[in-house]
Swiss-Prot record:
Quaternary structure and partners: Homodimer. Heterotetramer of two MnmE and two MnmG subunits.
Protein name listed in UniProt: tRNA uridine 5-carboxymethylaminomethyl modification enzyme MnmG
Gene that specifies this protein: mnmG
Native source organism of the sequence: Methylorubrum populi (strain ATCC BAA-705 / NCIMB 13946 / BJ001)
Presence of keyword Flavoprotein: yes
Superkingdom as given in the UniProt entry: Bacteria
Pfam family, one: SAM_GIDA_C
Subcellular location as annotated: Cytoplasm
Molecular function in Gene Ontology: flavin adenine dinucleotide binding
Amino acid sequence: MHAESTRYDVIVVGGGHAGVEAAAAAARVGARTALVTHRAETIGTMSCNPAIGGLGKGHLVREVDALDGLMARVADAAGIQFRLLNRRKGPAVRGPRTQADRALYARAMQAAVAETPGLTVIEGEADDLIVEAGRVAGAMLADGRRLAAGAVVITTGTFLRGLIHIGERQIPAGRVGEEPALGLARTLDRHGFRLGRLKTGTPPRLDGRTIDWTALEMQHADADPVPFSTLTERITTPQIACGITRTTQRVHDLIRENLHRSPMYSGGISSRGPRYCPSIEDKVVRFGDREGHQIFLEPEGLDDPTVYPNGISTALPEVVQAGIIAAIPGLERTRILRPGYAIEYDYVDPRELDATLQTKRLPGLFLAGQINGTTGYEEAAGQGLVAGLNAARLAGASELAVFDRAESYLGVMIDDLVTHGVSEPYRMFTSRSEYRLSLRVDNADERLTPRGAALGCVGSIRAAHFAASQGALSEARTRLDTLSLTPNEAAAHGLALNRDGLRRTAFQLLSYPEIGWDRLAAIWPDLAAVPPRIAERLQTDATYAVYLDRQQADITAFRRDEAVRLPASLDYGTIAGLSNEMRVKLDGVRPTTLGQAARIEGVTPAALTLLAAHARRGRTQATA
């Protein structure tokens, strides 16, 4: 046993997608940071599907990038099939996504961590927290090492009392071949945190050399791949195609015949899994009338024969999995390299947190990722960045940062978690935001990079790149505002406008669906020199301009309610007229603002009026 004690400003437990962003963010702010993980070689491991981004998720990756996080740049370096989802829909709901080479991704992430000044990787298992005077003061490792710190961030993913299920077999593990985190689960239990159980699953991995690719429909990468990071000029990694197949009636019959052997239906698992990523057993039971379910065969790397069959997550016994695979077109002779499985794990009710991701119960302790009830690499990365940033600011005695719903999907996600809690793994969608016209992938840097610079987590390279980009955008916008046409002049160029005699600027012309940048460049040739990314951004701004003006009124009202602070020590029992039901609901969340109180399910307008009056009286007394 070791008895050494080392001092850091911030300790991050876990080297997954939340952990690396937390550690890197804390170090960027200037905190002396330790990243504690079982093995350094597993940092950045993609435990489930080899992909980054998607609908809603791509927005989070862009926001992490805007705050100088790692995920976007690493995904750009490792991406092997870039596709922009929802390309035919409006810009606000488009989602960049890429398949990633699993090995390339981990190597690139490990290199990024190694190159981060002030960040030390410590191999070991965090077994307990050091608590002094009612607040976290460090972490104890299983081998006896004592790490002192001003703040600790826990990002244990599925490791917290993790239990793998394959048919009737149960294997204690955080993921295949790795031990679960039992000590920290006991620690959180001991300190009174509300813990629950969730589950997720993964499909069997296939040997791509035994797949009949000629029998499959192929899905190719975009010809013009869109990077995640604004710092990435172009994608240089070779791009590959994925195969598409479907389940068959024979597959469905096999599943129905063996449902009693699936832990989700035998009683082996009672916890809930992700609604939007159901197992193949759930799909067959819930959508029994369908003839087949789509499966995407996603290669896990350029030099790796392993294929991830996206769409058939399962925990059925291995022999049943083999039968299922053999009954799928193109996979009749395919070899399974590793069986699919379900995994149960502990999570902390996220209503135990405030909007900074610090726990209310234990100051100095921050939580991020699946431990907060979310699912997905991108959700984890976003939380990790916010938690690491705030842990560093707490250790440095600076004011903590809150990202609100009107400025970012990060704010939407965190507010959803800490206000509503979860009953199933939380996944980000654009539909979760009431301000999604403003929260687009193309303006994430404009929304968040200046904020990140003020908070100290944006480095000089990104700051300089952002300044140059904004300068070019402003110059192009000014040029559009100085160019104009009358309806008659427009008609001479083949543009049909209302003959009202009013001049319209080039920016206003862009708001017409039939007028694109190419049409304007034909009229004013110097516009052809504007970089495509800036031209596309200005076209989007013009398209949404009238709607954004209306939305700004909603945002102003939102910010007005968010400005009404509710004291952390507020005793709801002292507010006359507040019903017992309202007191219980409010006490369960302990909202920090009137706006957050309004978002608690079941809180009535009458209760909000009483809260607002109480807050006003408190301000009056404080200034008297």
